[in-house]
């Protein structure tokens, strides 16, 4: 039984990856797909965005 649940969960995650869905998209299906990252949902993405914008300013 435990192995069956593990296999089904792994298959579900693989299908999500196959169709290109992220956890944030599943959590907020009404969100604009091209919008900036939600700071509450993904603080790591917000940090990355600020680093990229800083690099753009420094490099021109």
UniProtKB/Swiss-Prot annotation:
Q: Where are the AXPX repeats?
A: 27-30, 31-34, 35-38, 41-44
Location in the cell reads: Secreted; Target cell membrane
- GO molecular function annotation: toxin activity
Main localization of the protein?
secreted
Record field: transmembrane: none
Taxonomy, superkingdom? Eukaryota
Residues recorded as bearing Leucine amide in the entry? 59
> In the record, which residues are listed under signal peptide?
1-27
What is the tissue specificity? Answer: Expressed by the venom gland.
Instruction: Provide this UniProt record's keywords sorted from A to Z.
Output: Amidation, Antibiotic, Antimicrobial, Fungicide, G-protein coupled receptor impairing toxin, Immunity, Innate immunity, Mast cell degranulation, Membrane, Repeat, Secreted, Signal, Target cell membrane, Target membrane, Toxin
Q: Which GO terms describe its biological process?
A: defense response to bacterium; defense response to fungus; innate immune response; killing of cells of another organism
For this record, the Gene Ontology CC terms, alphabetical, are: extracellular region; membrane; other organism cell membrane
- Coiled coil, from the record: none
State the similarity comment.
Answer: Belongs to the MCD family. Mastoparan subfamily.
The record describes the protein's role as: Antimicrobial and mast cell degranulating peptide. Has broad spectrum antibacterial activity against both Gram-positive (S.aureus MIC=96-128 ug/ml, S.xylosus MIC=2 ug/ml, S.alactolyticus MIC=32 ug/ml, and S.choleraesuis MIC=32 ug/ml) and Gram-negative bacteria (C.koseri MIC=6 ug/ml, E.coli MIC=3-16 ug/ml, K.pneumoniae MIC=128 ug/ml, P.aerugiosa MIC=128 ug/ml, S.typhimurium MIC=64 ug/ml, V.parahamelytics MIC=32 ug/ml, and S.enterica), as well as on fungi (C.albicans, C.glabrata, and C.neoformans). Does not show antimicrobial activity against S.mutans. Affects membrane permeability of E.coli.
- Protein name in UniProt: Mastoparan-B
Write the lineage as a comma-separated list. Eukaryota, Metazoa, Ecdysozoa, Arthropoda, Hexapoda
């Amino acid at each position: 039984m435990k192995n069956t649940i593990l296999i089904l969960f792994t298959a579900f995650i693989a299908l999500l990856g196959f169709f290109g869905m992220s956890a944030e998209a599943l959590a907020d299906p009404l969100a604009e797909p091209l919008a900036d990252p939600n700071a509450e949902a993904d603080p790591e993405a917000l940090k990355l965005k600020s680093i990229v914008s800083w690099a753009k300013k420094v490099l021109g």
